[in-house]
Swiss-Prot record:
The active site is at C337 (nucleophile), H436. Catalyzes amidations at positions B, D, E, and G on adenosylcobyrinic A,C-diamide. NH(2) groups are provided by glutamine, and one molecule of ATP is hydrogenolyzed for each amidation. Pathway: Cofactor biosynthesis; adenosylcobalamin biosynthesis. It comes from the Bacteria. SUPFAM superfamilies: Class I glutamine amidotransferase-like, P-loop containing nucleoside triphosphate hydrolases. InterPro entries: Class_I_gatase-like, CobQ/CobB/MinD/ParA_Nub-bd_dom, CobQ_GATase1, CobQ_N, CobQ_synth, GATase_3, P-loop_NTPase. Residues 255-444 form the GATase cobBQ-type domain. This is Cobyric acid synthase. One of its GO terms (biological process) is cobalamin biosynthetic process. Belongs to the CobB/CobQ family. CobQ subfamily. CDD domains: CobQ_N, GATase1_CobQ. The keyword Glycosyltransferase does not apply. Pfam families: CbiA (PF01656), GATase_3 (PF07685). The gene is cobQ.
Length: 500
């Protein structure tokens, strides 16, 4: 049996493109016939993914597993950190909530336990897969943190993995960041760096060549590729920094205006990704009432702290403005997970799960009352949804720590196993659900927006299959990276590294 070969991608800073490059290698290895697993020891993100067996991991590793054509599992991201309050995060270990911890306590009290979980998860994957594509986090040169870090060079040592360092040229100063990172590494760790990739390049590659030659001569580290910027890649983003790029690139020409409310604790914002594929829709992020206008659709995404985000909306005039627009019949509101909880009459927090406030009034647009609980629900779900006189099969996943109970006038949105899930107004102007990926259901998404189109006198649209768009995006990304990165050379380095 051939030995498992790992490769690790680290970056000079956050958002250098580690996740995308790792996704490309997952796809390429799978295309070449290797059973491949992604791995990120510790991920800090509010964008998560539910595995088929009901465990919660970082969204990036779930998407990378999809790119590799394998089922996602908890070992692919054994530790997930979900910021919930100032200086406090929920720690998820092997897909299940471990508890809430402050940063100092996590670093000082959890280190050895975390390291043991990471080591065991890595060993499990290396016993079952041919290739392990490992992603680091932030920078490996954080000298103030490296004595107890759990995600960069310590993981490379555990896996005995060669490291490819990624620099983001889009931000400027790419050679300084690459050279500086290499200079700050411990000598033994620096020996693990077999090459660098320069990511997000725009312009004439000939102008970059003198810099590449200088870098290789100065450091002795080869440049393994220069990856040009790849626009309109329909693959879920994980980093909140991606929201900044999304906001900056939103098309203002769409006939259907969709306002996504961006609160400070926004979570699982990939729920809106399919909306970006609708050719006549303009999707924009809104943070206060002055930006809202009179959109056709308002989306309230998930939240890691629903009460804080609801209070944020009230303070910025968004809550009252949304209620007015709905009551005037000028908009349709969709609440997803935390957004659904906000649409109800009240949110109760008797155990102080999110805030010291025992009860907060909701927007009062749906007849439900929510009680936040200590236990978390993480499950994949499937049911039937009736919309515009048609019944649709819908599937998605739930991640929440609350229970919403019906009040008089309640109408369920989805039927799941004989029970009602979510809620809707009979006029269809307000709907809410705990089901993430609702708009990933192509037939329902098309029917939902066709109602809006008819109201605006627009032609109905045919179904656009989002899943096939994502599969095509994986292939497009893999082809792009194959063209611009010395993939065969990296594979040779992986084999040679194991012979040291």
């Amino acid at each position: 049996m051939a030995k498992t070969l790992p490769i690790m991608f680290q970056g000079t800073h956050s958002d250098a493109g580690k996740s995308v490059i790792a996704t490309a290698f997952c796809r390429m290895f799978a295309q070449d016939g290797w059973k491949t697993a992604p791995f990120k020891s510790q991920n800090m993100s509010l964008n998560s993914y539910v595995t088929p067996d009901g465990n919660e991991i970082g969204r990036a590793q779930g998407i990378q597993a999809e790119a590799a054509g394998v089922a996602a599992r908890a070992e692919m991201n054994p530790i997930l950190i979900k910021p919930s309050r100032e200086h406090e995060s929920q720690i998820v270990v092997l897909g299940k909530p471990y508890g809430n911890m402050q940063a100092f306590a996590y670093r000082n009290e959890f280190f050895h336990q975390g390291l043991a979980v990471i080591r065991q998860s890595l060993e499990t994957l290396m016993n079952e897969y041919d290739r392990i594509v490992i992603e680091g986090a932030g920078s490996p040169a954080e000298v103030n943190l490296n004595d107890r870090e759990l995600v960069n060079m310590r993981v490379a040592r555990l896996a005995n993995a060669p490291v490819v360092l990624i620099g983001d040229i889009e931000r400027g100063g790419v050679f300084a960041s690459l050279v500086g990172t290499l200079a700050l590494l411990e000598p033994e760790d620096r020996k693990r760096v077999v090459g660098v990739i320069i990511n997000k390049f725009r312009g004439d590659a000939a102008l970059l060549k003198p810099g590449l030659d200088w870098f290789e001569q100065y450091t002795g580290v080869p440049v393994l590729g220069v990856v040009p910027h790849l626009p309109d890649l329909a693959i879920d983003a994980e980093d909140s920094l991606a929201l900044e790029r999304f906001a900056a690139s939103s098309d203002d020409k769409g006939a259907i205006d969709i306002a996504v409310i961006r609160c400070p604790k926004i979570a699982n914002f990939t729920d809106i990704d399919p909306l970006l594929t609708e050719p006549d829709c303009r999707v924009r992020l809104v943070t206060h009432a002055g930006e809202l206008g009179e959109p056709d659709v308002i989306v309230l995404p998930g939240s890691k702290n629903t009460i804080e985000d609801l209070m944020y909306m009230k303070k910025r005039g968004l809550a009252s403005r949304i209620v007015s627009l709905v009551n005037e019949g000028k908009t349709t509101v969709v609440g997803l997970c935390g957004g659904y909880q906000m649409l109800g009459d009240v949110i109760r927090d008797p155990h102080g799960v999110e805030t010291p406030f025992p009860e907060v009034k909701g927007l009062g647009l749906l007849p439900v009352a929510t009680t936040l609980e200590r236990t978390k629900t993480t499950v994949r779900s499937e049911g039937m949804l009736t919309w515009a006189g048609e019944r649709f099969s819908v599937r998605g996943y739930e991640i929440h720590m609350g229970r919403s109970t019906p009040l008089p006038g309640y109408v369920p949105l989805i039927e799941i196993g004989g029970r009602g899930e979510g809620a809707k107004r009979e006029d269809g102007r307000v709907l809410g659900t705990y089901m993430h990926d609702l708009f990933h259901n192509d037939a329902f998404r098309t029917a939902f927006f066709n109602v809006i189109r008819r109201e605006k006198g627009l032609a109905s649209s045919a179904v656009r299959p989002f899943h096939s768009l994502k599969e095509a995006a994986f292939d497009r990304l893999a082809a792009h990276v194959r063209q611009h990165v010395a993939v065969e050379r990296i594979e040779q380095m992986m084999r040679q590294f194991q012979q040291r």
